[in-house]
């Protein structure tokens, strides 16, 4: 089973994350940020990852540290669960519609972290959640998971729909990218022999 747990404690946050890449989409999310809980629940369900996330953060200041550190810890757990990446499909992409919004997500489990994030929001908040934290979470996750990740919203009006299309797109792309390709016969999918 490809699974891992990470605990991360700083002066700003105390986080415990567990992920099972070969799960059923079960989740138990408690970040203290309702909208982020919703997005991570979508991530688990659409990637078919089992995901447990507990964040105690300095929400009396704002949501930034909790959102970013959650992305860091989840990225670290994802990378640890993947191990040496033997047999994975590695590359995946998807166009994910959410009502009027359409987002393209492309991922390479490369071990070379990089994020291209071409998504904009017309409003500063979704409920109490700062929309700029969507990018912060994706940046933290991609850097710590070792992913080359491209997220581009082609169009959309509703900020909730745009954010949801980003997270669901990530989920569906990761679901394909981490899938074991039986033709790889346990090899690392790289001419270098490692990722």
From Swiss-Prot:
Localization per Swiss-Prot or TrEMBL: Cytoplasm
Example GO biological process: L-histidine biosynthetic process
Record pathway: Amino-acid biosynthesis; L-histidine biosynthesis; L-histidine from 5-phospho-alpha-D-ribose 1-diphosphate: step 6/9
Pfam families, sorted: IGPD (PF00475)
Keywords, sorted A to Z: Amino-acid biosynthesis, Cytoplasm, Histidine biosynthesis, Lyase
Cellular compartments per GO CC: cytoplasm
Gene3D superfamilies the record matches: Imidazole glycerol phosphate dehydratase, domain 1
Reactions it catalyzes: D-erythro-1-(imidazol-4-yl)glycerol 3-phosphate = 3-(imidazol-4-yl)-2-oxopropyl phosphate + H2O
Gene Ontology MF: a single term: imidazoleglycerol-phosphate dehydratase activity
Enzyme Commission number(s) from the entry: 4.2.1.19
Major location category of this protein: cytoplasm
InterPro entries associated with the record: IGPD_sf, ImidazoleglycerolP_deHydtase, ImidazoleglycerP_deHydtase_CS, Ribosomal_Su5_D2-typ_SF
UniProt similarity note: Belongs to the imidazoleglycerol-phosphate dehydratase family.
Protein name: Imidazoleglycerol-phosphate dehydratase
Organism (species): Methylobacterium radiotolerans (strain ATCC 27329 / DSM 1819 / JCM 2831 / NBRC 15690 / NCIMB 10815 / 0-1)
Gene: hisB
